[in-house]
Swiss-Prot record:
This is 2-methylcitrate dehydratase. Pathway: Organic acid metabolism; propanoate degradation; Carbohydrate metabolism; tricarboxylic acid cycle; isocitrate from oxaloacetate: step 1/2. NCBIfam families: PrpD_hiGCgrampos. Pfam families: MmgE_PrpD_C, MmgE_PrpD_N. Disulfide bonds: none annotated.
Amino acid sequence: MVRIMLMHAVRAWRSADDFPCTEHMAYKIAQVAADPVDVDPEVADMVCNRIIDNAAVSAASMVRRPVTVARHQALAHPVRHGAKVFGVEGSYSADWAAWANGVAARELDFHDTFLAADYSHPADNIPPLVAVAQQLGVCGAELIRGLVTAYEIHIDLTRGICLHEHKIDHVAHLGPAVAAGIGTMLRLDQETIYHAIGQALHLTTSTRQSRKGAISSWKAFAPAHAGKVGIEAVDRAMRGEGSPAPIWEGEDGVIAWLLAGPEHTYRVPLPAPGEPKRAILDSYTKQHSAEYQSQAPIDLACRLRERIGDLDQIASIVLHTSHHTHVVIGTGSGDPQKFDPDASRETLDHSLPYIFAVALQDGCWHHERSYAPERARRSDTVALWHKISTVEDPEWTRRYHCADPAKKAFGARAEVTLHSGEVIVDELAVADAHPLGTRPFERKQYVEKFTELADGVVEPVEQQRFLAVVESLADLESGAVGGLNVLVDPRVLDKAPVIPPGIFR
């Protein structure tokens, strides 16, 4: 289907310039959010897939420390008519439920992605919108509408504005998307959505140090924080509060001081009035628990190991890939931590040399076993790991940024040099699970991912109840969206780490 997208020029303006509110980027996004277009059936189906996907990775992360911390914080904020915290009974303040559920969905780096000018994980919009829907008794159809908008705005901003070039974390696109999505879901007026978007962006701009060097657990908290901030921004705007404006284009705004500066013009595509919002269909989930740009290399490594045979005969491996892959998870980052056997899990899942080495040795990837400290410290793994490097290839960079989804690629070409001098070469453009891959994810694969990761965590009866609720999401009446919560076996939660008390109790 050909989409009618309007390309908006976005640049900095001086305060003295004649720049009416209706030309502000936040206003144009609010127009899209307030446009009551119908949701295409395949788009609604994909929303359900991504809700299942988030539940899968949330179940797998339930007893990890960051998730346990966030859950404890949320449980300190019970309310009578609130939202659900993943895994447990009770009713809690929507902002804190979104916080806990956002950390659970993001902790394992295992849900959906969209890559273009910048990076994004648009399923990070799901926890805050579901939490607000649960607290306010929103019906399933309106939740779907809101999520479709959130995905659209998040992906369109990611297409048009590069944040990482200026060392700004990609959650700066998430905050406005959450605000816009909630605005659609609650059918708020355009002015209210405009101010909510401005506040959300203003408060979710932070540096990329969260994904550089020794990466900490904040990587999982960052999108949850943006979601929480987005909820609070909408709440204030609904009560009549305004926002810094123009937030992107102002003389002291985001573009002028945090991004490319007053001389640069960004071009952001947005749906034309009356145009269905379909951007979610351009995003893709993960089969492997690791940074998305390592998905195709993992599949490539699993394929290559049979051709190589004795891995001890490897002298070197060079992965030719895109600029983004090279500098974010490859040796172009200059991060020595990416070669440290004692590095955190968060650091290792952003180390393509480590990931490729383990996938090559094991022929598979596991969200826990592949990151185990004893796995990372294996002497043969460390030896192989240090033989792997990345280089930027202009052709892979071009394909990474290609506007044609059929030609867009996030893979690599591997050149494996053996001690004998023989060179083995293979390449893979997209991951097997990608829509254009050899085993693309459809509903069946999303359900299989959920049942696999929920095994031993969620009782089978509860798994089936949850899946049935998701299947009927579009028909859920007001108050029934609480059924999207998944209850976890209490014996599993008993295995969670003991967390020292904080301020919230």
